[in-house]
Amino acid sequence: MRILGIDPGLRVTGFGVIDVSGHRLAYVTSGVIRTPTADLATRLGTIFQGVSTIVRDHAPDQAAIEKVFVNVNPQSTLLLGQARGAAICGLVAGGLPVAEYTALQLKQAVVGYGRATKTQMQDMVTRLLNLSGQPGSDAADALGMAICHAHGGNTLSTLGGLAPALAQKGLRVRRGRLVG
């Protein structure tokens, strides 16, 4: 099964594609969609077109996207919601089922700790997918979203699904930290 993860943002939208076979996770591609400094409609169109292109080029079976959180600044929350909507439209236009997870669910499923830092997310994604280099934070969050979906969005402690992948690499999670 191929899963596309999306980390929505008005300026930068991260994407990550992984293949899942049993408990094995394989990296396919990741990156970001950068919007131009332009009016809102143009930026949303760029996100929609970018996501549509990724769906067309990589043919994922399912997609997962981060839910919007209510920020201190309501204007920022509204803009993020619109960017997220443009990405969802690109996914749905490509015929994909879309799952949604909160940032807390994402961090718990990937790192094992709901208050994990960006660096911890990047480190864990790099290790789980056996990447030679560390992806940027937006791409890492998107890859993490795909990993979260691959394992049903459950926490690392209840899932057993990541345990074999971690054990193969000589790793385990203890108190929300990756230890070897």
From Swiss-Prot:
This protein's record includes keyword Heme: no
InterPro entries found in the cross-reference section: RNaseH-like_sf, RNaseH_sf, X-over_junc_endoDNase_Mg_BS, X-over_junc_endoDNase_RuvC
Names of required cofactors: Mg(2+)
Cofactor binding mode and count: Binds 2 Mg(2+) ion per subunit.
Signal peptide range: none
Reaction(s) catalysed (UniProt annotation): Endonucleolytic cleavage at a junction such as a reciprocal single-stranded crossover between two homologous DNA duplexes (Holliday junction)
CDD domains in UniProt: RuvC (cd16962)
Binding-site list for Mg(2+) 2: E66
Keyword Kinase carried by entry: no
Subcellular location(s) per record: Cytoplasm
GO CC aspect terms: cytoplasm; Holliday junction resolvase complex
EC number, UniProt record: 3.1.21.10
Quaternary organization: Homodimer which binds Holliday junction (HJ) DNA. The HJ becomes 2-fold symmetrical on binding to RuvC with unstacked arms; it has a different conformation from HJ DNA in complex with RuvA. In the full resolvosome a probable DNA-RuvA(4)-RuvB(12)-RuvC(2) complex forms which resolves the HJ.
Record family assignment: Belongs to the RuvC family.
Function recorded in the entry: The RuvA-RuvB-RuvC complex processes Holliday junction (HJ) DNA during genetic recombination and DNA repair. Endonuclease that resolves HJ intermediates. Cleaves cruciform DNA by making single-stranded nicks across the HJ at symmetrical positions within the homologous arms, yielding a 5'-phosphate and a 3'-hydroxyl group; requires a central core of homology in the junction. The consensus cleavage sequence is 5'-(A/T)TT(C/G)-3'. Cleavage occurs on the 3'-side of the TT dinucleotide at the point of strand exchange.
Name by which UniProt lists this protein: Crossover junction endodeoxyribonuclease RuvC
Organism: Burkholderia orbicola (strain MC0-3)
Chain's gene name: ruvC
